[in-house]
Every structure is written in C-alpha cells, then in structure tokens.
Amino acid sequence: MSTGSVSDPEEMELRGLQREYPVPASKRPPLRGVERSYASPSDNSSAEEEDPDGEEERCALGTAGSAEGCKRKRPRVAGGGGAGGSAGGGGKKPLPAKGSAAECKQSQRNAANARERARMRVLSKAFSRLKTSLPWVPPDTKLSKLDTLRLASSYIAHLRQLLQEDRYENGYVHPVNLTWPFVVSGRPDSDTKEVSAANRLCGTTA
C-alpha cells in the first residue's frame, strides 16, 4: 500500500498516468531484466517487421500526420514495376541498329561505284578501238574522247565522198585510203545499203 509520501515512485507513476503526462525518467522505478528486454528498441523494430498488419491498424487509428508517415514507411513491392515495364515494352518492335543501316548504305554505294567503274572500262575500250581504226593517227598519239569522235566523224565524211565519186568506176571502188568497214570492192550500192549497222560497227568485212 501507498504511504502517501511524495517520494514513492509507484505513486508518482500512477499520478502521472492519471494526469496524462509522462513521469520523469529520474522518478521511474527501475526495470527488471525481462522488462528491459521487452522494452528494447531492437525488439520493437523486429516486432513491427513481423507484424505489418498491426502497424497498419495503428496507422489507421492515428492522425493524418501519422498516416502520412505510415504511408512512407510501407515497403515497396519489388519487381512489380519492372514486370509491368517489361510487359509493356514487350509489345514494341525493336528498332533497327544504326550500324546495320550504315552498312547497308555503304554496300549500296560500293555496288554503284563498281557498276560505274565497269561502265567506264567498257567506254574506254570502245574509244581505244575507234582510235586504232582511224588512219593518219600515230599509235602513240594521245587523243581525248572528244578529239577521237571528231576525227572519226571527219573520216566517215571523207569515205562517203570517195564512195560517191568513185562509184562503179572501172567496175569497182578503189580500196586506197579505205579501211574497215568500207571495204566494198565492187559491190553495188544496193548491196552496200543492205549491210547491217552491226556489221559496219562491230566487225570487219572481206
């Protein structure tokens, strides 16, 4: 029983509970070993982790400020957002890599360059054959393509003039200054016209 003395710690604690204010730590009775183990903060934290439902109930009964704190303390679900993100991203088609597009453009450019080089080689060979067919041109003379075409045009005009002047004279066309493809050697004009353009341009006639 209480003796009524102010220094009695149990009575002070009882009065503090009745007046709803905490008892000073200096006047609290000493806790026993078992009570200390229950009151340790580590046990409280472990109890809170093991009993999340109880914590949610306390948060529901608390004030708005404490509810906000409880919302912040709720653990986030790991992997939920990642699974949703992966599910949403799975429907999108992967974009083509920049390296493959650059390689495709480079291959197309290389193919176009190869075709252009082949065309220029064929054209150069054709001009070389035309230059060797022209008379009065030394073999070591370097002519441009334009000069070669001009000489060929003048040479063709000269041959046509010779054919018109010497036609059917002595029964044949004199072959002097005549080279391929104008070796007709006595053929009539009708036979000359029937010679195809391919034979005149691509082969020698005897």
Swiss-Prot record:
Annotated Acidic residues bias: 46-56
Low complexity bias spans: 93-102
Which SUPFAM superfamilies does the UniProt entry name for this protein? HLH, helix-loop-helix DNA-binding domain (SSF47459)
Compartments, as annotated in UniProt: Nucleus
Q: Where along the sequence does the record place the motif called Nuclear localization signal?
A: 71-76
Q: Which UniProt keywords apply?
A: DNA-binding, Nucleus, Repressor, Transcription, Transcription regulation
Tissue specificity note = Expressed in lymphoid tissues, B-cell lines and activated B-cells.
Report the SS bond pairs. Answer: none
Report the protein's function. Transcription repressor capable of inhibiting the transactivation capability of TCF3/E47. May play a role in regulating antigen-dependent B-cell differentiation.
Tell me what this protein is called: Musculin
Source organism per UniProt: Homo sapiens
